[in-house]
Amino acid sequence: MPFLGQDWRSPGWSWIKTEDGWKRCDPCSHELRSEDSQYTINHSIILNSGEEEIFNNECEYAAKKRKKEHFGNDTAAHSFYREKWIYVHKESTKERHGYCTLGEAFNRLDFSSAIQDIRRFTYVVKLLQLIAKSQLTSLSGVAQKNYFNILDKIVQKVLDDHQNPRLIKGLLQDLSSTLGILVRGVGKSVLVGNINIWICRLETVLSWQQQLQNLQVTKQVNTGLTLSDLPLHMLNNILYRFSDGWDIVTLGQVTPTLYMLSEDRRLWKRLCQYHFAEQQFCRHLILSEKGHIEWKLMYFTLQKYYPTKEQYGDTLHFCRHCSILFWKDSGHPCTAADPDSCFTPVSPEHFIDLFKF
């Protein structure tokens, strides 16, 4: 039977809860220190010069050893999850016991720093949204805490730089719906932690939603070159780069020129052709009074029935040779002869599917 003591006869360690977490306390430490201070004797009284030099050397060596051990423990604590990859295994083998869970992968892949990278931001937000919809209760307690810490950083980032508020509003809407169902249906599903924790999380999410609702984007005073100063063909080229219809609509509200360009039928036709198949067009064909196809209305109509293609600047990758999930920039210790041929981009949906057993 495992025992948390230095000696098998001892009653175990005592712990005290502080603001920084649980810390081990020694009930006899204060009495020993007070007694030690009372009976401290100057060692020079009982030692001669030669013995005193040996005593000082031993004390110095012991101090250096303690400092080295402390530094080693501190370094190990900081670099425990330094590697930004994880081995994905779904069954026990002779070499590996157990299996990798979604919560473990979520903790190991360093999503906290990934949100600071503009290429990975949308990918991480989409992944958090999928977890909020269906996988929140499958996370461990540590993974859930990490999840909400990352979400807090995302909300603060949006409030500070005023970028991607619509994306985060959608995430918080799905999360608040899930938390509301879990809180109202307490007892119907297994929740990790006390119900009060989940109520507190729901209140926090509602507070974040209110902050984003009150977000006011201040107009920047810029005396340099602005978007409206660019030629029409460059503005049109920028609009054709967008893959989200709502981004086109939002940009069209900036100036009358951009509004005129955003209403171009060819722009919306290409957007529909990019996201949807021709068979889907025929099922939801929308014509104007003059008999022309309303591509803009068709895009938003088709969006309700079919999923749109998603683009990400950077995604997680899976190595088929090593069965390792990793960020491509960080890499992983691959043993394949041609590593690049073994890499497969992992979409947020595929990431969730990897951990369904």
Swiss-Prot record:
UniProt-annotated location(s): Nucleus
Interaction with beta-actin as annotated region, ranges: 1-83
Keywords assigned by UniProt, alphabetized: Actin-binding, Nucleus, Ubl conjugation pathway
GO CC annotations on file: nucleus; SCF ubiquitin ligase complex
Main location (coarse class): nucleus
Free-text tissue specificity from the UniProt record: Expressed in all tissues tested, except striated muscle (at protein level). Expressed predominantly in the cerebral cortex, the hippocampus and the Purkinje cell layer of the brain. Intestine and kidney show also significant levels.
Domain F-box: 225-273
Molecular function GO terms recorded: actin binding
PANTHER family on file: F-BOX ONLY PROTEIN 25, LD30288P
Subunit structure: Part of a SCF (SKP1-cullin-F-box) protein ligase complex consisting of FBXO25, SKP1, CUL1 and RBX1. Interacts directly with SKP1 and CUL1. Interacts (via C-terminus) with beta-actin (via N-terminus).
Name of the molecule in the record: F-box only protein 25
